[in-house]
């Protein structure tokens, strides 16, 4: 298939600049595969569309406040580092701006100078290996003090509270972007879901900035996905296998949870406790075998995410549903309304 097959026209005003308040006040489009119907609801009504015995699988990755504004030593020139992944110890792979002026040996100070960094080397793609020094026990304490959330480029409004870009169940630090389908859940909603006999399991997939990288190839099969680290615990693997054995549904919350489970299934032919890196790319023609339902947001035109949705729900039905979403003025992208394919 071609990239242009996944294009749709989206009015700019439908790109959400802030999350719903409260979180579960977001709208919910329910795509009923059995009856081939589109239903319009609100996210706090999600429990009504779940069944006793269902299992929701959420991604518990936590977003790092990984965007650091600093000054070069001794010139005082303003610069920016965006932490992408931990290489080893206090050395991280970073995106640097202005990259050409931050060569090996460049020293940077942040805040009151209690956090510093030295550029070690420049990688072939222009990213940098950077080693940090600080006066606290961990770097994460300094990131909480000086760092900002690395919001997607299409969100131009500053957040009032950085927790707005974290799920309420986030615990494993490591993502450069939020697993956004989970932003709709509140603790109260999760309690209601559990009270209906629905279980909730956790996986971890640390979302990389590659999630925003556009597909540049005309033929989507030629696209090379970025690599991301994931982990599935023994407890989660057991819950998934017990749910399937009992004939109940495994429902992925978000494309990251979906990609985690499908990666494990593709490698082992079943769900097992494991961790590793995945660059799985799911698009029409690839059968999803690990999930029975998917809760997700409304994604960018021509993105790998809308291609994944098309693989699960069907290309024609997906594009038709997106057309309806635009007509009904649903909100799109990271702070968007939600879709439940059941």
Residue spans for each PLM region:
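Surface-exposed, charge/polar-rich loops and edge strands
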Residues: 1-342
């Amino acid at each position: 298939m071609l990239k242009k097959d996944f294009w749709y026209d989206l009015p700019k005003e439908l790109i959400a600049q802030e999350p719903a308040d409260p979180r579960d006040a977001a709208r919910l489009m329910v795509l009923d595969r059995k009856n081939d119907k589109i239903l319009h609801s609100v996210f706090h009504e999600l429990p009504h569309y779940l069944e006793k015995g269902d299992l929701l699988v959420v991604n518990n990755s936590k977003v790092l406040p990984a965007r650091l504004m600093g000054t070069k030593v001794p010139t005082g020139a303003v610069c920016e580092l965006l932490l992408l992944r931990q290489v080893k110890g206090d050395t991280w792979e970073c995106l640097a701006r202005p990259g050409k002026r931050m060569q090996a040996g460049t020293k940077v100070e942040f805040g009151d100078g209690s956090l510093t960094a030295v550029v070690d080397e420049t990688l072939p793609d222009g990213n940098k290996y950077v080693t940090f020094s600080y006066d606290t026990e961990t770097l994460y304490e300094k990131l909480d003090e000086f760092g900002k959330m690395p919001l997607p480029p299409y969100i131009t409004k500053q957040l009032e509270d950085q927790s707005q870009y974290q799920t309420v169940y986030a615990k494993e630090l490591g993502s450069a972007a939020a697993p956004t389908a989970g932003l709709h859940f509140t603790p109260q909603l999760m309690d209601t879901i559990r009270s209906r006999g629905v279980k909730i399991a956790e996986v971890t997939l640390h979302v990389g900035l590659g999630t925003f990288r556009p597909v540049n190839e005309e033929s989507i099969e030629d696209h090379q996905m970025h690599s991301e680290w994931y982990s599935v615990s023994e407890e989660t693997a057991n819950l998934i296998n017990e749910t399937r054995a009992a004939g109940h549904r495994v429902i992925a919350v978000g494309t990251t949870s979906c990609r985690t489970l499908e990666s494990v299934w593709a490698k082992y032919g079943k769900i097992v406790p494991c961790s590793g890196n995945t660059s799985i790319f799911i698009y029409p023609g690839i059968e999803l075998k690990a999930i029975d339902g998917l809760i997700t947001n409304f994604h960018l035109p021509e993105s790998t995410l809308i291609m994944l949705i098309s693989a699960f729900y069907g290309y024609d039905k997906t594009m038709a549903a997106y057309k309806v979403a635009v007509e009904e003025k649903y909100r799109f992208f990271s702070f968007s309304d939600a879709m439940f394919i059941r």
